[in-house]
From Swiss-Prot:
Assembly notes: Homodimer.
Gene Ontology CC, one term: cytoplasm
Species per Swiss-Prot/TrEMBL record: Teredinibacter turnerae (strain ATCC 39867 / T7901)
Binding positions for L-aspartate per the UniProt entry: E173, R219, H449, R489
Protein name listed in UniProt: Aspartate--tRNA(Asp/Asn) ligase
Matches recorded under InterPro entries: Aa-tRNA-synt_II, aa-tRNA-synth_II, aa-tRNA-synth_II/BPL/LPL, Asp-tRNA-ligase_1, Asp-tRNA-ligase_1_N, Asp/Asn-tRNA-synth_IIb, AspRS_core, GAD-like_sf
One MF annotation (Gene Ontology) recorded for this entry: aspartate-tRNA(Asn) ligase activity
Xref: Pfam families: GAD, tRNA-synt_2, tRNA_anti-codon
Amino acid sequence: MRSVYCGVLTAANIGEEVTLCGWVDRRRDHGGVIFVDLRDRDGIVQVVFDPDAEDNFALADKVRPEYVLQVTGKVRARSESTVNANMATGEVEIYGTGLTILNTADTPPFQLDSFTSVGEDVRLRYRYLDLRRKEMQHNLRFRSKVTNAIRNYLDEHGFLDIETPILTRATPEGARDYLVPSRTHESKFFALPQSPQLFKQLLMVSGFDRYYQIAKCFRDEDLRADRQPEFTQIDIETSFMDEEQIMSVTEGMIRKLFNDVLSIDLGDFPRMPYSEAMEKYGSDKPDMRIPLEMVEIKDLMKDVEFKVFSAPANDPKSRVTAMRVPQGGEIPRKKIDAYTKFVSIYGAKGLAYIKVNDKDDLENGLQSPIVKFLPAEVCKAILERVGAENGDLIFFGADTTKVVTEALGALRCKLGEDLDLYTCEWAPLWVVDFPMFEETDEGGLTALHHPFTAPSCSPEDLQANPATALSRAYDMVLNGTELGGGSVRIHNQDMQQAVFKILGISPEEQREKFGFLLDALKFGAPPHGGLAFGLDRLIMLMTGADSIRDVIAFPKTQSAACLMTDAPGAVDAKQLQELHIRLRAKPQAAKDEAGKEEDK
């Protein structure tokens, strides 16, 4: 139906007869000449209809925005005064000699341009129209380009693209599963995979050596700006590689991707232990563009009379830290009060600070409500330890280790954004040496990553000191965003059972939920490991999109609903009967409580 795309025409095509298909972006009538901006996925070109071509002119007079047209005409140069430097096709136009209206269109509920502000609910309800917008066309074409580059890289490095099941069984991987009732197996359910984790490990046992998949994954969890109930993962697994080799291959992939697609050289990725990331930056995915660090001052506060600092300083489960903000003394008190409210979200009871007006005058040069409670020698030691200069602001955290780390870590990122402290555009990083386990609120242990991650010690040492064991895990971080996480896996049955035991999974539960994996580990499982990248998050970062929903064709809302299709939806009684399911009415008390939660 067409010979060329609208957006690719240039001066090199002048004189050619072309046939185009697309949508009417705009129609203008100037002095008896009709101009139609015709749009397709590659861009826009101007088509001119004049009264000499009577039939075409009359038809062109009827077209309206978003009509679908087929246009035949000759490419000609625009006059010098009408050249549009803002359009890729701005040097040329089409002199229309043929016109067919392929379809009409109702008036869209919003303008499909980059300048009109439209509520996201409206955009998602009419997603098929929203996707016609230039920004969305760019994002999805960019996504296709990225996945193609990733496939090419992995293919060149000997990886095989192998699909794994979507209908599987529930396994404890952290989030809630999406369950699918089985019609043929009464009272039993499939689960949609949270990741292809166990299947890709089994592929290594099967001898495929290098596997990858652009995989759909599903997690029934509360949503945020960077989360979706169904998301896409770049899933990778290898045999006979240690963590350094796996990190080298995957780092090479991301570096080549950024270089090929964005012409950006990320350089080598530095390594940082998890303990350092948490102590200095308050996050296991620190944004290294921000030149702010937490400095431990617990030892300086143990003997001060100010209980706000001395109490946590003498508590082994607490910490006292200081964070210097260069030239932060200009921050007004009203803004400091706002930051105090901000850290309270993370459990902080307050936000102490000192403004350094004159570091050499400890009596009069420090401005703060807390200075009067601190001896001069302590103030001097704090200034020296954080490297304070005149005009700086020092924030303090004093509470449990968890509260201080999370509160000042979040404040660090907020200050970086508010004060535009970024020192570079891109800051990649590997975070390594993660703890094997973390403590639950009930005092037990849970896997920091997942229960199939290999520890860096023997089964005996692991069982003797599980709380201090380190894992062979690694996370790739870029600009404070976790691009991907992975680990060397457990390939020995004894070690896997030892980990399950520490996690409180009984032998019976091990056999019920993971019997197939434990059996596979007995039949010559090779050393193996891998990594998974969040594709949606990666695209969001590379395009600069505000939300992950802007890089997915048909995303869900933050309440996990599709406004366009009205999913999830009710099903009829016959379908439920076939699945052996009966719905019970929610008790009125529960309905009332749910209503209260919605009101919040």
